[in-house]
């Protein structure tokens, strides 16, 4: 009886070790592939907010981390520096809209040296399908309305939904979500306008990791 119990215990131990080893091996073999896929997805988004014609450097490897309350969080946010012939041409910066209807909304905005928005995309959100999710380009083209716009002292108050006297469309039954994104993009652009030199002087220290 005791011998049988020992044999069963040994069998279970061997099985557990084999299973653990197989999981570890699978993770090891797929880790590089996952990282490669993440880099491809990141590059695809970056090329949507900074045209490929505006840079000749590897954007995912030209990344620094910046911190400012205007980015909607006190966590350091990845910021990608586009250069051409060694000269900076644009910045793509991630930021947070902390006041979305269902929580935080993460966006990325490309901004040229004159403070003009080259493109904005939503990276992640939890907004209600059919209502707040219209901020997502896969659902509607609303997010494209930021392209070409600038943030100045004169037009600051126009960075609102039309219902509040601004220039941006709201969604039927979902005003909180666009308000949050508009405010986040405005504050992000304002931060870059005020801190461009400081951003460009930062060391490249996040190596394209989306932290």
Curated annotation (Swiss-Prot):
One of its GO terms (molecular function) is electron transfer activity. The modification FMN phosphoryl threonine is found at residue 175. The chain crosses the membrane at residues 9-29. It holds the Pfam family FMN_bind. Its EC number is 7.-.-.-. It is an enzyme of class 7 (translocase). InterPro entries: FMN-bd, Ion_transpt_RnfG/RsxG. Disulfide bonds: none annotated. Belongs to the RnfG family. The complex is composed of six subunits: RnfA, RnfB, RnfC, RnfD, RnfE and RnfG. This is Ion-translocating oxidoreductase complex subunit G. It comes from Vibrio parahaemolyticus serotype O3:K6 (strain RIMD 2210633). The gene is rnfG.
